[in-house]
Amino acid sequence: AMSTDPTLLDPGFRPGLEFGLYVVFAILGANMLNQGIWQRVYAADGEPTLRRSFGVAALTVVPMVLLAGLFGVAASGLGLVTPETQSVAFFLVVTEVLPETVAFVVVLLVVLLVMSSADTMLNAISSLVTVDLARLGAVEGGRSLRLLGRGLTVLVALGAIVIGAQGYSVLQLFLTADLLAAAVFVPLIWGLYAEGLTERGAMAGSLAGLAVGIAYFPMLRGVVTLVPGIGGLLPEPAMLPAFLGATGVSTLVTGLAVAVGSAGFEFEALSTEIRSFDEPTAEEPPATGEVSD
């Protein structure tokens, strides 16, 4: 790798440092909005278990990310990477270096991993929408909610298949979604703790951050320039200011919204206003488990 491109292992290579910095904001925002992670948070049997799980995961992910990065370095050193294939550098190295049998096993494990992640995300998205519909009173009854959840899972899966069939860059899709997450996650998390943050304040912070991020984001430049009168006002596209701007501006606007906000949300009300769908209502007595003839 060093003989091919000395910058691949140069710790002071500025483009590499910039990439690592904005990827931190991208992944942080994406994970804060990852409903699969929030499901695991609420599935933990207590705070000690949750802290221990996050600690083990944080220690485990470091060597995994380092190893994944080295696969990219190896792919570049072997001359396997092009702008169109840089997002699949891992598979390029596997198919080039490893025997076919080992490569098949690796690809099979990766497919199983993707299926597991997709299953988590599909269920998380459909359950999120289902819960909101139940909260709004649009759907009543456990059976109707189950059918709706299954139907939403199928629709989301079909949408993912349609998008995947277009041949878009995996890296481009991830970074586009991460930009949205980078602009939204601070108002979302801040709202869990700040009593003075209103819905409008959180929305203003999210939209302001997203506007700045899109203005700099290179991958959406072609779409943004289609808006009349916008093209000449856009700054030079760059990833680092896109993600830093999205997170920083949303944080700043959200902080201002908290400072000027007067509506105080009572978090104690959650214990009385929020209940599990499995809990019986006042009109519905709990089941006794007895079976009558």
Predicted feature residues:
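Membrane-embedded helix-loop-helix hairpins and adjacent transmembrane boundary segments
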Residues: 1-293
